[in-house]
Amino acid sequence: MSCRSENLWLELIAGSRKTSNFLWALILFLGSFAFLLVGTSSYLGRNWISLFPSQQILFFPQGVVMSFYGIAGLFISSYLWCTISWNVGSGYDRFDRKEGIVCIFRWGFPGRNRRIFLRFLMKDIQSIRIEAREGFYARRILYMEIRGQGAIPLTRTAENWTPREIEQKAAELAYFLRVPMEVF
């Protein structure tokens, strides 16, 4: 989502609170909990899940392995839920022609560097660059070349932009910033 005026462009960046992340975290939690439950029921000799009689699953080695996978899955699931609750990767890109400043803000993981805030002068922007890689795993990323800083990605690598969409966004941004556009 973006908001534009004559001198200001504000681009809101979605973080990890996406439907797919919620679904994967839920599926992983339920599956790993079921694995842990089957492993525990094979150890105790009780039938906690009606689909798998505990007498058919021996604790060693099947129950141990299922318990291990259940615990590992719960750790990964908790990591995903924390990432979703912290909304890692969300933020905004703000381009202000009136003040001549570009601000890039992202939320990170908790700690000393939770808030990632970059500020540049517009006169230091050399170009807007599109990096396109075609093939089996095609990816198109939009970069902003900053003098003395290198390239800063403006789009996420997981976003699947069509060539037309990424080119249009790059052209609009380059026109707004009054810088050249490069394609690699």
UniProtKB/Swiss-Prot annotation:
Residues that span the membrane, as ranges: 22-42, 57-77
Q: How does it sit in the membrane?
A: Multi-pass membrane protein
Query: Which UniProt keywords are present, listed alphabetically?
Result: Chloroplast, Membrane, Photosynthesis, Plastid, Thylakoid, Transmembrane, Transmembrane helix
Q: Does the keyword Transit peptide apply?
A: no
Q: Name one Pfam family in it.
A: Ycf4
**Which InterPro entries does this entry report, sorted A to Z?**
PSI_Ycf4_assembly
Give the signal peptide range: none
Compartment list: Plastid, Chloroplast thylakoid membrane
Q: Name one GO cellular component term.
A: photosystem I
Q: Does the keyword Membrane apply?
A: yes
**Which GO annotations describe the biological process of this protein?**
photosynthesis
Question: What biological function has been recorded for the protein in this entry?
Answer: Seems to be required for the assembly of the photosystem I complex.
Can you tell me which family this protein belongs to? Belongs to the Ycf4 family.
Protein name per UniProt: Photosystem I assembly protein Ycf4
Q: Which organism is it from?
A: Pelargonium hortorum (Common geranium)
